[in-house]
Amino acid sequence: MKNRTIASFLMNRMKRPENRIIVLTGGRQTGKTTLARTLFPDYQFLSIEDPILRGTYARLTAAQWRELYPKAILDEVQKEPSLIESIKSVYDQWTEPRYIFTGSSQLLLLEKVRESLAGRCIIVELYPLTVPELETENWAEPVVPSPFQKLLSALDNTQEYIKSLLPDFALDPAYAKKLKAWDFYTRLGGYPALVNPELDDEDRYLWLLQYVRTYLERDVRDLAALRDLEPFVRLQRYVAFQTGAILNYSGLAQQIGISTKTVQRYIRYLEMSYQTLILPAWERNKSKQLVKAPKLHFLDYGVLQAITQKRGTPSGQEFESLVIAELLNKNAASLWMRTSFTCGPLMVKR
């Protein structure tokens, strides 16, 4: 089992008196439930996906929650939004109870959380494993920050830090482990289930194909209530082939044969279900030299391959998406491009 960078942050936050509710959200199968149960073994685990138990929990009063479940993990809590109001009542009346909500739908979960728990909770997003996390063997092994993460924390002394990386990364004693993690990441992505040593690459690829099917059949139907998935599938596949490209809604509408508003809605579904990131153009001012059109990036290369049904070395744009996804956990990133489109460096705000 791989360690997660965010683990120590969650444990420290839950010790604070003001952080009595943590909302842990992210895409399906990113390890939210495993992380919560591993870090907080003394918390009772309540599966809100169970339709029978769901009704039982919904009937509990605030006093009963405090008595029966003073510390609990509510898994997939968006399935029963009324529970959020119940926990809010517990929070407002007592200081001892602690709760962790997990959920895979950003839209269904966070809209209710923002309505009911504003100022009462912290929201943490969990993405697939990063390269430094893939290097770990277990929870006890610390996650070593990547050179880029270290560079961002050393901006006051950048030149000295860069010199410390020379003459060659290959001289690093951990080079072999890092290379293995990077190879895995650029072939299969970072979903935790894929690191099971009993799986071979063919098993992993089949898992990714099933993940995409499950995402369409469950997440998209829950999120968008779509009766006909075929137009959404066409758009998903088209933008997967175009990951890292400038996002042009009207152009996509013409290519796929749906309205621009429908394209915008479908793109929003992809983003809200943690499949893609819309990276805005860098805008310090209104200069005409800046391109304001955003880029769309898929957040996991393994899922991208399953959608496009291709394997092999990432293309230039796919590699760009790999890098963006790797940086997402740690940094706020924005794109800056000249109107000539001849170069597109990444601007990262410290």
Pin down the residues of each PLM region.
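Accessory nucleic acid-recognition modules appended to NTPase machines
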Residues: 195-350
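Interdomain motor-coupling "hinge/lid" segment immediately C-terminal to the ATP-binding subdomain
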Residues: 114-232, 236-240
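Sensor-1/coupling segment of RecA-like P-loop NTPase cores
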Residues: 92-113, 270
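Hydrophobic positions on the alpha1 helix immediately C-terminal to the Walker A/P-loop
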Residues: 35, 39
